[in-house]
Design a protein with these regions (language model features):
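Alpha/beta catalytic cores of nucleotide-metabolism and tRNA/nucleoside-modifying enzymes
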Residues: 2, 9-26, 30-152
């Protein structure tokens, strides 16, 4: 889907240009808290923008904040992560409408790394991508929650 890597050296050059006096926001290939910290330290950016790494992982912002603040926060549980995915679904449906909210959300849910390790997940992922109602998607998420707990 996406090829190549972000060229952060160009972002660093812009940030270190003495003629530029605006906040510089770095974007590209930030998928972990460690990568966000490296962007701040190595390139001096004022902020980072997170893109694809948010797909099915809306908690990444909290993970990055806790890591940068060195809070030693406890990682979210599976239940908390699935609760966030359900909240994301609810917000998208309320913000748009059920049909388009589900179209937007279901691909993010299917891409969530939380489901890695679930045996024979392919059919469940296909069901997520074909779901047309909130009830279908929340039912699938409930099933996933139970399956994850069974393998922990």
């Amino acid at each position: 889907m996406y090829t190549g890597e972000a060229d952060w050296s160009l972002i660093g050059e812009v940030k270190n240009n003495p003629r530029i006096h605006i906040p510089i926001i770095g974007n590209g290939d930030i998928t972990t808290p460690e990568e966000a910290k490296l962007a701040f330290e190595r390139y001096g950016v004022d902020a980072v923008m997170i893109g694809r790494a948010t797909f099915g992982r809306p908690w990444i912002f909290e993970e990055i904040r806790d890591y940068l603040d060195n809070t030693g926060a406890t990682p979210l549980t599976v239940d908390e992560k699935i609760d966030l995915l359900e909240e994301q679904l609810r917000i998208n449906v309320e913000r748009i409408d059920e049909y388009r909210g589900i179209l937007h959300t279901r691909r993010h849910l299917a891409a969530s790394p939380i489901f890695k390790g679930i045996p024979d997940f392919r059919q469940t992922r296909i069901a997520m991508l074909r779901a047309t109602t909130v009830e279908e998607l929340t039912g699938i998420l409930k099933e996933c929650r139970e399956r994850i707990k069974a393998i922990e």
